[in-house]
């Protein structure tokens, strides 16, 4: 017969193991790939839902079906400390309106179309002008950043698919266009964005994601100390209205040469004409590629935190924008005021104003065809 104190000790050990096992199971469950959703208000009489994507490493992405907007991305630094690295707001109301397009899916046509017009199959189309003489990010009314999409969480993955029908004539564009955007967060700390579209009439299509990143943490200051590499030997120079001239200019010998890692702020205020026109960087780079597959476009590194963002895409171009027009009038999360150059965008895309430049890669989607593109944001540290 065992002594009573020995039996008591065994019971305590068993209880401790049970409690520890439950705690471990709960912790593991918390860090499995998952999608959580909750009501986030209403817009235009339709419910808006917030989706939180979580992977096995504890990385989280918040997105909503209004505008396909990414509200937050929480990733660790080199010490394992998590921070939100995208500009944004804590409520739906902060995104209505959203002049800087913070976090949004932009379309039908991301970037600029000169003079708000293009000709297709012999017919001229007029679009709303919302950027001086130009149309920016699709116009003013039914642009993709201003509408409520249908949302459906993915099964067995940390992801969500948004779908939207852009009707014939919306913002002047032809064709009923069915659009699908899927966000998937992998256990490799990749946010994968898949874009798809079909149409019943020929129409231009150019879709992108307009998140503003600050790898030191949103609201912590400017991004001038970040170090950027762009896999691009050429860019598309612009005129005074930020419309491509049609030239594909070599970056070598210019402040737009990021073929080797370079501090964003080291040349941003040079007197080079393109920087003067853009008030900093706001240009499309021509990605070096050998085929149509996924290709590294950019790598950004923030030395204080050690965070790294790599952007790969199937698209031909990437717009690097340094938040030159953030002017302190936008107050974001935790009361942070977003001042000039407090965030950067890396917008994968077709070239700006392609419908008016037949020598650029075509953006015309025709009936019976499908537009598909993929962009991957990969987060790491060094």
Q: Which residues does each predicted region cover?
A:
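Bacterial N-terminal signal peptides that target proteins for export
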Residues: 1-10
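Bacterial N-terminal signal peptides
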Residues: 10-21
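An exposed, glycine/acidic-rich loop-and-rim segment of catalytic or binding clefts
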Residues: 26-59, 65-382
């Amino acid at each position: 017969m065992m002594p009573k104190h020995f039996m008591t000790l065994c019971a305590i050990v068993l209880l401790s193991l049970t409690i520890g096992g439950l705690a471990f199971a709960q912790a593991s469950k918390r860090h499995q790939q998952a999608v959580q959703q909750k009501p986030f208000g209403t817009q235009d009489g339709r419910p808006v839902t917030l989706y939180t994507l979580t992977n096995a490493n504890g990385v989280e992405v918040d997105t909503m079906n209004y505008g396909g907007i990414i509200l937050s991305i929480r990733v660790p630094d080199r010490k394992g400390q998590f921070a939100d690295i995208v500009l944004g707001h804590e409520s739906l109301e902060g995104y209505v309106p959203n002049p800087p397009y913070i976090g949004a899916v932009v379309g039908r046509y991301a970037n600029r179309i000169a003079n708000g017009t293009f000709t297709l199959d012999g017919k001229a189309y007029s679009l709303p002008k919302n950027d001086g003489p130009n149309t920016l990010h699709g116009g003013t009314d039914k642009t993709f950043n201003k509408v409520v999409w249908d949302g459906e969480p993915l099964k067995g993955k940390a992801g969500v698919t948004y779908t939207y029908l852009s009707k014939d004539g919306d913002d002047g564009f032809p064709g009923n266009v069915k659009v699908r955007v899927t966000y998937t967060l992998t256990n490799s700390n990749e946010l994968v964005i898949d874009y798809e579209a079909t149409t019943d009439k020929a129409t231009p299509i150019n879709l992108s994601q307009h998140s503003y990143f600050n790898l030191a943490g949103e609201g912590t200051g400017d991004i001038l100390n970040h170090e950027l590499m762009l896999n691009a030997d050429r860019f598309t120079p612009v005129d005074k209205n930020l419309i491509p001239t049609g030239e594909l200019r070599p970056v070598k010998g210019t402040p737009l040469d990021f073929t080797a890692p370079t501090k964003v702020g080291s040349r941003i205020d040079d007197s080079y004409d393109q920087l003067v026109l853009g008030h900093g960087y706001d240009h499309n780079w021509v990605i070096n590629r050998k085929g149509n597959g996924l290709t590294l476009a950019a790598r950004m590194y923030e030395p204080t935190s050690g965070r790294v963002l790599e952007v790969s895409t199937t698209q031909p171009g990437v717009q690097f924008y340094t938040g030159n027009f953030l002017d302190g009038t936008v107050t974001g999360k935790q009361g942070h005021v977003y001042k000039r150059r407090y965030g950067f965008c890396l917008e994968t895309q077709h070239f700006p104003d392609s419908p008016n430049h037949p020598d650029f890669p075509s953006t015309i989607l025709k009936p019976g065809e499908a537009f598909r593109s993929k962009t991957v944001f990969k987060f790491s540290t060094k």
